[in-house]
Amino acid sequence: MARSDGFSPRKSLRRSAREHSRSYVGQGSNDDFDDMYSPPSRRRGSGGGDGNGYTRSGRKIHHSRYYEEDYQDAISSDDERMYRPRRNSNSLTYRQQCKQAIDESKRIQKVPPAKRKRIYMSDDEEEFVETRQMENTAPDRPTRRSSRRMSSTHEEPDVLDQEDVSPIRRTRRTTIRFGSEPVEENMEVPRVLETNDMANEAIVQAVDNTENGETEEDVIEKIGREEEEEGDEEEAESGEKEQVGLLFHRIFNQAYLQEDEESSNAESSEESTAPRQYSLRRRQPVVQFNQSEARENRRARLEHHRAANANRHHRNRNTSNRRRRSGSDSDSDDMVLPRPDKRQSRPHMHNRGERERGRFMPINMTEKELQSAQHILMDRMRKTDAGQGASDIDPMSVDSSVGFDQVGGLSHHIQSLKEVVLFPMLYPEVFAKFKINPPKGVVFYGPPGTGKTLVARALANECRRGANKVAFFMRKGADCLSKWVGESERQLRLLFDQAYAMRPSIIFFDEIDGLAPVRSSKQDQIHASIVSTLLALMDGLDGRGEVVVIGATNRLDSLDPALRRPGRFDRELRFSLPDLNARRHILDIHTSKWEENKPTPETLDGIAEKTSGYCGADLKFLCTESVLIGLRSRYPHIYMCSERLKLDITTIKITEEHFGHAMRRITPASRRDLTIPSRPLDERTSILLGDIVKNLISLRIPQGYRCVENAMATASTELEQVVRALEPNLTVPAIRLLLCGSPSLSDGGQTSYVLPAILAKLDHLPVFSLSVSSLLTDGRPEEAFSNAVQSAMRASATGPCIMLLPSIDEWIKVIPVSVQHMLITCLESMTGFTPILFLSTLDSSFEDAPEYATEVFRHANCISLNPSRRSVRKRYFEFVIDGVRRKPKVFDPTIYEMPQADDDSPEAKPSRKLNDDETRELLKMYTALQRQMRMFFKERLSRLIRDRRFVEFVEPVDPEEAEDYYEIIETPICMQDIMEKLNKCEYNHADKFIADLVLIQSNALEYNPSNTKDGKLIRQMANTFRDAIDDMIDCELDESFVERIEMVSRMLQDAGVTPTSDQLLTEIPKGFSRKKPWTMANTLAKEIEQWKAEREAENEKLKEKLGISTDTAQSAIEENKSEEGTSSSVEEIKKKLNKKKKDQKRNKKASSQDPDGDDTEETEEAVAENNVDADVEMKETPADPVPTIQSSSSQEREIIVSADSITDLIKLCVEKSEGWSVSELERLSSVLSHTIERFRDEWNRENLPEQLAQIVREWEATDATNEKIANGKASNKNGIVFNGY
């Protein structure tokens, strides 16, 4: 008869024992669960009598925790999935049930195994086993590994994605697998691992029935003591463990049968045709205590708990009469689950916050250092009550070798950081005495590559030294940004809370302008909220304590102005480009560890002079490039060979030439945007303008602009530097300079050469350009001009700066009049002590300057550049024409010795760097692979030993039966010997094991003849033995498992790690990589032999290349010997020279633009032949030699050129260039240099001076050419105007 449709006040507790046992174990846990979800009137200690009562429908409530009667009608279908009815029909006490279970288990042990194996199996399990037997697939043995595999198959599909390291081939189905046996041999073991849930249910049921408050452990201990009194002591100890397992299974069977009975009764009641009461409508109960909201909350929590369990346990929810199966989630045999945490307020959010809070860890502290102060940190974290969650960022790793001693040219910044960070910790009494707060904010700004992040790294390492350690948090601007609303603010708050808990601490924001830009109406509201949060955290109502905030940015003007005030960012440190002294210091730091390969001080001084405009990052890269160039010039063979060669590092000398090659490869960071025309004078133009630039800087520019920190730069000791740092900087007046031409020459190179050279000398100062291109970029010149002037005024508040206005005469023609008036107003507003150098150029003389230029600059501010003097031009053209005397470069490979291979060098460092955790995991993996391989081989070898067909190969041959066996067979072996080797871990690869098995067959075939009956039989057995080996390896051994062992062994060798238990595959050479998969035919040794053969072939090809180049170069050297003797005839010399002329004709035809080039080439050939005759006559009659430039070595060939012709050419160039501008001289020298380069590979250059003189005679200056073009007279015989090249 169906019961009424009432609701009970204890309905929330109607859960099956399985649901309780999955989360809690023991009486205490169930009581906690009862107190959590029970009404106050039903809780323990709150009164309420014995708990008996009646519901509103008239049903009796018993004293037990669960109802006795079925309530299938009272709950919905959804509740049925969470709750399971349970009858408490046990009339025996807990001790009686345990005793009965022990007796039943003893009785079962006497039953034969064939009848015993199905006792602990349900109907579903029997059906499952029968299905697997029909598929001829034996289930795995319930070991730790197989139980984990079974649970992952039925419950966790994502575990199958992990890589299997078993040596068994997975593509074949075999009856016997590695690490498993047929199920019939193992069904005797109780299936404890698969019945954890039901056993836990039995424990809870037993605990519920315990008398006098005894727990499960007390009952089991009492049972154990009773058994010890009855039997032997040793049998009792072993039986105590077995009794617990048998007890679990006995109670499990009772509970399972009881559930099946209840399910069948429920189904039969549902199928009955009797009419149900209250079938027309549901009767809603009267809620007395308004528990609907609490009931919904409880249902939500239970639903969440059920969903969490569903992710781990796949249950069959469609069939109500089928037992819910769930395997163990752990590979442990322990049945006791951990007690739940008693945090009631959102424990999952608390755990998430604890986990994500751990990601905000300082970057300069090790794990051991954090654990030593863990109790203090945890106490602080409880007090701060920070948010929950953080950004998904791991702490950055910082190079611990970087310190303040590795930072050059920034001594003032280092002293300022010490005042902010170190002094408040070391000398707090000073701040306490004067009631002041130390600075808590510093912002680094300056161009890229000037050392902002480097100083932060050095500060992080300095903070971890000494007794008082400072936590250093390093975050980039984008790290704290998130797409979720409010997430960025929460992460900032959590970061500051973590820093406050670990105080004293430092927070470094790299590229802070991306995190806190200027707030405006055009900006997104999210960024404004982030900036507001950062402002409040840095200086809000609650002080941040001993937390220092450091920010770094390349654009200080883009930072929000609210951050740039005392209390937030107290100090602003500018990182400018290093000056001459700073560059010299940086070069000393980067070359200090080169030891004997370090360049000379004179070389470093020259490099520091030439690297004007280079930042610290550029100088570091310059040193790297120079070393690579030096390595290439000393050992070019490493570029042609992929293997490691043995190098003598001490022979690599880094010279100034190597630095020069590296400087041509590098473009400094300050010159890549081309906004500032800073360019030093090269060696050629310095002859013309070097003295002018030097005198101009020393005489017209004050000392304060040349060196900002002059007081500290001139100090001799560190103490003097610290004391003199308090001295005010030198007085720097406001200066205006106008570079213009002279009345005789308007273009003296003031805009193209002198102005960039001056900026290169003053590259440590910030430069603000007012050029036409910078003002007209966005079409709003007034706004661009205002921004540039305001930036210059702000920069002048902290130090000198430069305002640049090139070509003011052209600037006036393009820029609007409003901007011109703004410039005059700006210059008039500057006082005499505003440290701004206003530098401009004028492309004419001051007398011809526009009226506006004379208003801005007075005559005293004008510097006129006169034409170059005669002596200067003579030195200039001597430098240009000196290339005529330069000998052709002949490659001599004999000076480059081929280094030897260095594969087995003990000095070679590991090519793969692994940390301790990675090394430990790799060693663990290699040990596990070796162990699985040995287990696999032992099992297969045991199978071969048990095979009666191969009984002759099990034991060693008896010498009495075969007297000459050990004389004929060199390496006798049997399967017992192989098993002993396996036990001694002598096999680290499958090839060795297979080779020993094959050796048994080869020994049998070698000793036993084929003409005897016994010999034929043994030979047949040996061949069958070989077939069994091949079939076993081919069908059961996975080739990827063998390749995995090789790969892990090679990784350990590359990392320089040697395991203690197992041996590495020492036969694998360095650099080896398998090209074909492993098979029995393609063994590791065969693959290594093929790899070595290919490598030898590559070495032979390399030697052939080197041999061909050596022979060719040697023949060229022998051709160029001047001591060839009279045996060399004139015809041979003519043939060699004519051969070279023919090769040069192709280049001349391609580069020549003269239509009469063929006649010229024929004339050159005739002249060359005449020169050859003259050369031979000169060798035969040395009394009348041809005038040549003598070489320092008499054995080398001399260049055929006339010295008088070169002198006449230089004189012609000096006279022709009278009154020319620097630009015109540079154009002429470029044409002359190009012509000289065409003859760089020739020894006969006698006609070269005449060609150069012809170019100079026909050259016309730009001004004179323009006049002749206007008159129509400027043309040569070919119709080409020589106004350039």
From Swiss-Prot:
Q: Where is this region: Disordered?
A: 1-95, 121-173, 224-243, 258-359, 1100-1196
Q: Does the keyword ATP-binding apply?
A: yes
Q: Tell me which PROSITE patterns the record gives.
A: AAA, BROMODOMAIN_1, BROMODOMAIN_2
Please state which protein family the record places this protein in. Answer: Belongs to the AAA ATPase family.
The function of this protein is: Thought to form a complex that enhances transcription from repetitive DNA sequences by modulating chromatin structure.
Q: Which amino acids does the record list as binding ATP?
A: 446-453
In its UniProt record, a GO molecular function of this protein is: ATP hydrolysis activity
Pfam families per UniProt: AAA, AAA_lid_3, Bromodomain
Q: Where is the composition biased (Acidic residues)?
A: 226-237, 258-270, 1155-1175
Which keywords accompany this UniProt record? ATP-binding, Bromodomain, Nucleotide-binding, Transcription
Q: Where is the Bromo domain?
A: 928-1032
Output the Gene Ontology cellular-component terms. nucleus
Single biological process term from Gene Ontology? nucleosome assembly
The reply to whether Nucleotide-binding figures as a keyword in the UniProt entry is yes
Q: Under what name is this protein listed? A: Tat-binding homolog 7
Q: Which InterPro entries has this protein been placed in?
A: AAA+_ATPase, AAA_lid_3, ATAD2-like, ATPase_AAA_core, ATPase_AAA_CS, Bromodomain, Bromodomain-like_sf, Bromodomain_CS
Ranges annotated as biased composition (Basic residues): 311-325, 1136-1149
